[in-house]
Amino acid sequence: MRNLIFTLLFLTVFTSIFAQEVQVIQWFNLISDEVKFDDPFEKLTEGQIYDLSYIAKMRMLQERKPGSVGAESLKTIKEKEKKLTAEGVDIEGLLAQRAAITELRTKRAEAVVDSLNGLYVRMIGYLLPLDFEGKNGVEFLLVPWVGACIHTPPPPQNQIVYIKFDKGYETSSLFAPVWVEGILRTKSLTKELFLVDGISEINVGYAMSPSLIEGY
């Protein structure tokens, strides 16, 4: 009886410890908070961003090739400048920050969370197959939304996990919704995604060889 009690106690403690080691994470957990900055463009509406982009494009054309922008386009520029100014948009200030903000956005998209490296995690996502053995996929990209990398541009690389699953996971469609469970690695990779119209190179910030893939 004493041995039975000891065995049950051991199994209970072991199961509890193992359960605590599995960390359920969300996609936002993969985004590093080390690259912080105030992005003034995030405060603009879609219409304001469009108008600002139009102004920047026309100015660039005029600068590269004087006289290439017609009278009608110049009139449109003036109208958009007047409209944005009335809305409180600092046109010159924003255009001057474009290069710096673009660089910071790139750094933020590439930055991974180093503290996640080596942790046993469980997360949800959509499988985009890269390679098959028979009917089973053995390499995938785990992405946060349906259509990523094919119907929409690729997510930032810290929002893509490269999955290598030697056991193979049978899937009859793209973007199968799944739970994956395994040791997460911070690893910068570039994977080739074969599309109907060519090959797309996808930058990835994380990798995993899961112990488990299951549909949901």
Where on the chain are the PLM-derived regions?
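Sec-dependent N-terminal signal peptides
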Residues: 4-13
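Contiguous, function-dense segments enriched for cysteine-driven chemistry
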Residues: 16
